[in-house]
From Swiss-Prot:
Major localization listed first in the record, in broad terms: membrane
Domain of life: Bacteria
One Gene Ontology biological process: aerobic respiration
One GO cellular component term: plasma membrane
Organism: Chelativorans sp. (strain BNC1)
Record's protein name: NADH-quinone oxidoreductase subunit I
Residue ranges constituting the 4Fe-4S ferredoxin-type domain according to the UniProt record: 53-83, 94-123
Family: Belongs to the complex I 23 kDa subunit family.
Amino acid sequence: MSALAQAAKSLLLKEFFGAVVLSMRQFFAPKATLNYPHEKGPLSPRFRGEHALRRYPNGEERCIACKLCEAICPAQAITIEAGPRRNDGTRRTVRYDIDMVKCIYCGFCQEACPVDAIVEGPNFEFATETREELYYDKDKLLANGDRWERELARNIALDAPYR
């Protein structure tokens, strides 16, 4: 570039005004930022949040105590104790605990479950004050399942073609 062209460019401040125009265009464009606690963005049906144990529509818990989720958990965060076999030959859990401090939210437990009993739900706001509150027992997991059942069923139905 010649010295004359360089001088004309710097005197006319072409780059400066180009930058101002670009800034003004972006200033008046619609914003992509959400004001988080007041506005929440959409979550994917495959989102892996807080764990929950589901029930059948008749109220019976789904978990059949097969312990596949306990076996596949890479963080060894799941502990299950199976009860004795019932008269109809089925088993249910006596104890189902998840240590959420250990959990890495990989979703293997959900994928391994043959009856869709353990799922990772849409809730991601479960911060606590103590570590003990992050130790989920069977009652807490069933309560989560009852609270989020509509969203859980919808997410599983949306994800069904890909399973």
